Regions:
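An alpha-beta-alpha
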Residues: 217-288, 323
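Segments of small-molecule ligand-sensing domains
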Residues: 401-409, 423-491
Length: 507
């Protein structure tokens, strides 16, 4: 107070100028955070969803979910544009297939980034051949859309909502791929195939690598992979061969509650193998719990007491290094041991821990076999079961676009066959009339026509669909991962021992 009047204090920002800078920074930061929260778009049809902000939705290939799939996404985008331009110019109709799966796997996923890329490459090769080679007819042409289902219920729901919005505009009739055999996957597929009157999408669904037997329950779903029962029966048939006849088997199973793959694989193998050939006790572990490596060490210590000749591993490939590591230094490693697994092990050579696997194979007197879904080495071992190499032959479209990528994990072949199966049903329904329309409900009716003379000539073997949507006597390659890291097919088996051939279908 001066001369009876109050003097206003200088503002804090004026007394300390740096406070103004600090305040402006806070405002900018808050504004940026608000913008990020409000602007969830990643691209056309794709947006950030969930706490991790993963980009989920549907793209025609313009948006790349990761750099890992950038090249194949760009090729799909180019082919889709060509299909649209052909309709504009010549009136040639098209329909769309959505390839739906988790597109951004992390280190906990059973799917590797290489396997994901290969699967999409195979899907693209099938799209390209459908639009350029016409072995399954020529109309309608095929667009391929890529949908990321993410890793949570919220993200899966967002992806399905985006598909729903685009059904009419993009003429979507089928969803392919679909991921792996989990409870979450099954529920997602039910929403895909359920009638629209019940809140579903009412689209045909074709799984690429779904093997759990429980997926037979899903109406409107077919799959191109052998079921776990088929894989287990094929493994049991292989173990009846001269080299393995009489050898005793110990089963090790992942008891993770929501993994239908591991549970049904174990159940099917126990049913397929004669009781006298196996130990009564099934050794279990739970991969969803901490300390699985310690559990494997304790579990494997019992091997020298049990003295099995074969360990049948009903688990995920991501856990294989932890299973094998204790075998390298077991007391009884003078006794040879065969570890036999299911198809999920096909991705182990691309995953973390493969060097540890090779160390055990080199030093632990261990042989590693698995029943695969597809492998190029099978084509020469059982030619009658494999009517065509198709896109994967030396002059095929896969080699044209992805010559440097390997086929050993089988994912490219399975992605290709899933899309080829959808195309076969589309063209069977669409025929040659350019104005005949195909719908999702029509697709679900046509799935069961794909048998006999209409069986699909897949690169993974003949796909003759049964009424439950699973392929009949699908070829199952028995594959070895050698101590040198080389992956080779050693036999081709099937449920019942012999895979389906064209001669069988001809009567």
């Amino acid at each position: 107070m001066t001369d009876g009047s109050w003097v206003r204090a200088r503002p804090l920002w004026a007394r300390w100028p740096w406070n103004a800078v600090f305040g402006a920074s806070l405002i900018a930061l808050a504004g940026g955070l608000l913008w990020w929260m409000l602007n969830t778009s990643c691209g056309d049809g794709v947006r950030r969803v969930g706490p991790d902000g993963q980009c989920v939705g549907v793209t025609d290939g313009k948006y790349h979910y990761t750099q890992n799939v950038a090249k194949v996404s760009a090729l799909i985008r180019k082919e889709n544009r060509a299909v649209e331009q052909e309709e504009s110019k010549n009136g040639t109709p098209y329909v769309s297939i959505v390839y739906l799966m988790p597109m951004v796997p992390d280190e906990k996923d059973s799917n590797t980034v290489d396997a994901l890329r290969h699967e999409l490459q195979g899907a693209y090769a099938a799209q390209y051949d459908a639009n350029h080679h016409f072995s399954n007819g020529d109309v309608p042409r095929i667009k391929l859309l890529l949908a990321n289902s993410g890793s949570s219920a919220e993200q899966r729901s967002a992806a399905l909502d985006e598909i729903r919005k685009r059904i009419e505009a993009d003429r979507i009739v089928a969803v392919a791929g679909l991921g792996t055999s989990t409870n979450a996957t099954k529920e997602m597929i039910r929403k895909v195939t359920r009638p629209r009157s019940e809140g579903g999408l009412e689209l045909g669904a074709v799984g690429a690598v779904l093997t759990a037997d429980t997926f037979d329950e899903v109406e409107g779903l077919v799959r191109v992979a052998p079921t776990n029962s088929d894989e287990a029966a094929a493994a049991a048939a292989f173990l009846q061969s001269k080299e393995y006849a009489g050898k005793r088997v110990l089963v090790v199973q992942d008891s993770k509650p929501d993994d239908q793959y591991t549970r049904t694989l174990s159940q099917a193998f126990l049913k397929a193998l004669p009781e006298k050939r196996r130990f009564a006790r099934v050794e279990q572990y739970d991969s969803s719990q901490a300390g699985s490596a310690t559990n494997f060490k304790a579990l494997m210590a019992n091997l020298c007491t049990y003295k099995p000749d074969v360990v049948y591993f009903a688990g995920r490939g991501v856990d294989l290094p932890k299973l094998l590591a204790p075998l390298r230094t077991r007391i009884c490693n003078d006794r040879p041991l065969t570890v036999f697994a299911g198809d999920d092990v096909s991705q182990s050579p691309q995953a973390a821990g493969f060097d540890e696997i090779l160390e055990t194979l080199r030093d632990g007197n261990v042989e590693l076999l698995y029943t695969g879904l597809a492998h190029p080495g099978a084509w020469k071992l059982a030619e009658g079961a494999y009517p065509t190499e198709g896109a994967f032959g030396e002059k095929g479209s896969y080699r044209k676009f992805f010559r440097n990528d390997q086929l050993d994990d089988g994912q490219a072949i399975m992605g290709h066959d899933a899309v080829t199966t959808a195309v076969s049903a589309i063209r069977l329904e669409g025929g040659t009339a350019a104005d005949q329309k195909v719908s999702g409900s029509m697709m679900m009716q046509r799935w069961k026509s794909l048998h006999g003379v209409h069986a699909v000539a897949g690169a993974s073997g003949l796909i003759s669909l049964q009424n439950n949507g699973s392929p009949e006597r699908k070829a199952v390659p028995v594959i070895e991962i050698g101590s040198d890291g080389i992956v080779r097919t050693v036999a081709v088996s099937a449920n019942g021992g012999d895979p389906l051939t064209r001669k069988d279908l001809a009567g």
